[in-house]
Amino acid sequence: MASSNLLSLALFLVLLTHANSASQTFFSFDRFNETNLILQGDASVSSSGQLRLTNVNSNGEPTVGSLGRAFYSAPIQIWDYTTGNVASFDTNFTFNILVPNNAGPADGLAFALVPVGSQPKDKGGFLGLFDGSNSNFHTVAVEFDTLYNKDWDPRERHIGIDVNSIKSIKTTPWDFVNGENAEVHITYESSTKLLVASLVYPSLKTSFTVSDTVDLKSVLPEWVSVGFSATTGITKGNVETNDILSWSFASKLSDGTTSEGLNLANLVLNQIL
């Protein structure tokens, strides 16, 4: 009877080890609804299921000085204090930016990882994620910047990696195409700390990529919210819509218990045999 109980315990430990060896998150939206999102500022979900980050008037035209943010409703564990392990993640989304005929684009949108409970920051070129202070925002973002701001931007429209600042640590020029759907793929590999973001216009077969190493554990809290932030220009001549059409996200964080659990299971089995 004792051997039987020990064998059952060993098998349980093996199963428990595999069940708890990683924390994983996955979700996918082809249509959005408010139930699965935290909406801030002017962000809303349209009747057709699009995530509209910034405001439009009754004629569907973008408005000046709009700011909106939207995050997945559940927090994501991006690293583990006990083990020191960091998650890898992969996200895909499609967005569309439309600029009226009588205006220029401004200011852009960003995919962001922010502290849980984070509130919108400054409008305009700060994209709702940062402000002019020297605060530690505990924020990592990939920005799709449509307007040059002389205080921190390169001179061209660009895709940038932002770490605690609106001044990107790495940028690549971006040939923005008005009204065209853009498909974005962003990956983070924890073993190399490499963050890679690629944008493709499928209809034009053009692509743009930016990458750099980012130590998420040194920047972000253990638990974050993932989602989007966008702003329109603060003057009438520079406005745009900022719509997310679809979004998927997957992350995996190893909890470091696999080897410990197997060692304990082996110890129990050795006592039986």
Swiss-Prot record:
Signal peptide: 1-21
Disulfide bonds: none
InterPro entries from the UniProt entry: ConA-like_dom_sf, L-lectin, Lectin_LegA_CS, Lectin_legB_Mn/Ca_BS, Legume_lectin_dom, Leguminous_Lectin
Family matches, as Pfam families: Lectin_legB
Glycosylation site residues: 33, 92
GO molecular function per UniProt: carbohydrate binding
Domain of life: Eukaryota
Record keywords, A-Z: Glycoprotein, Lectin, Signal
Family stated for the protein in its record: Belongs to the leguminous lectin family.
Name of this chain's protein: Leucoagglutinating phytohemagglutinin
Gene responsible for this protein: PDLEC2
